[in-house]
Amino acid sequence: MSLISPLDSISSASVSRMAAVSVLAVGLCTSATALAQEPNDAESSTTTWGLGLGVMSEQEPYAGIGRDNQPLPLLEVENRYIHLFGPEIEFKLPSLDISDSQELDFGIVVQYDGSGYEEGDADILDGMSERKGGFWAGAKMEWSSDFVDFGAEWLADVSGNSKGQLINVGLERTWDFGEHFLLTPHVGASWQDAKTIDYYFGVRDDEVRFDRPAYAGESATNIEAGVRGVYMFDKHHSVLMGVEVTRLADEIKDSPLVDRSTTNSVYLGYLYRF
């Protein structure tokens, strides 16, 4: 089970996608893992590998930027100590068994996020200084039960571009349909501090023009909801799919760089496990 993950973080879009891509990438992959049998002690010490290719279509929040459609190479490596998938690596910490049906998992995560923009990306960004993505690191916790799964994650910008912090939380439940198909609705919230919002959506004094007033970002919380699915043909071949909608916080919508109140993303991929 993986509720939260970086970022996403795979292309140069706004920071609001970080939780989204994580759901559509890492979450999709680990859902497929759940279809397989639970590993015994001997199997848990081995390393599993997976390779694949996906495509994502996402609506950007910035004015004048349409949908961003791009291929996504997929690489997965997992054993009892680490889980690497896409732009994120998790270093697993000891878990806590609360009962036969409840477990707490902990981890240290590092992920790359490609958020940001260049001034040539849209007319509204002409004359703006480049906003860069970078590496984020932090800790995560996941509580799993028979009824619902909960995840929480704290991340900090270790690249020093925004010098910001994020807190992501999410709830999900997975339904099995036969032996091959999983469907997982999920909801979540992503809090971003004032430094993060100001870096990606603020307008500095030297960037002001007649249709782009100065804007200082404040901390904000986006609300996200979506569904992902995994169809596993056998233990090697899986098809991954996902859809997510994000309601942007007022602190983002009020930016003169933004012309919408929601964003959305659609994902489809194929993964081969060795």
Residue ranges with predicted function:
Residues M1-T46, G64:
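Cleavable N-terminal export/targeting peptides
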Residues A36-L84, E88-K92:
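Short glycine/proline- and aromatic-enriched beta-strand/turn motifs that initiate or cap beta-hairpins
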Residues G54-M56, E76-E78, D97, K140-S144, ...:
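Transmembrane beta-barrel domains of outer membrane proteins
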Residues Y81, K92, V158-L240, E244-I252, ...:
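Outer-membrane beta-barrel transmembrane domain signature
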Residues E43-L51, N69-P71, R80-I82, D100-F106, ...:
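Outer-envelope beta-barrel architecture signal
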Residues L51-S57, V77, G86-E88, I108-Y112, ...:
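Transmembrane beta-barrel strands of outer-membrane/channel proteins
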